[in-house]
């Protein structure tokens, strides 16, 4: 069977609060690891750290890529425009953990909203 990369999170964040209970993302990662598929995870949450053990296993056999979006360096503003997700600082810390685990990451600066977070100060702060 030809292998490919599976992806989750392109339309909505897979690590919603309910995921703490149902653990569907973890189950999907386990299946990907068992069958030898790579995995791309797109999230604004640091909750994926719960599954770091499986992400490392997948990355050893095939490849894992974690993509995260950064919107603003202002933590209070982040909490207002992106409630219920990890703050920029928490995401940055999670990205450092992934780097230390040799897991490739992609960072998106998005959305860039005119007159809201498109300032030079914000972009340099991120």
Q: Which positions does each model-derived feature cover?
A:
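Conserved AdoMet/S-adenosylmethionine-binding subsite of the radical SAM
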Residues: 1-126
């Amino acid at each position: 069977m030809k292998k490919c990369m599976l992806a989750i999170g392109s339309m909505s964040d897979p690590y919603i609060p309910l995921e703490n209970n149902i653990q569907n993302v973890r189950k999907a990662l386990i299946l990907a690891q068992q069958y030898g598929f790579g995995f791309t995870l797109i999230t604004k949450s640091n909750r994926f750290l719960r599954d770091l053990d499986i992400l490392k296993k997948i990355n050893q056999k095939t490849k894992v890529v974690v993509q995260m979006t950064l919107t603003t360096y202002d933590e209070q503003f982040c909490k207002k425009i992106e409630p219920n997700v990890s703050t920029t600082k928490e995401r940055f810390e999670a990205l450092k953990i992934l780097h230390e685990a040799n897991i490739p990451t992609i960072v998106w600066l998005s959305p860039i909203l005119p007159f809201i977070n498109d300032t030079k100060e914000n972009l340099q702060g991120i």
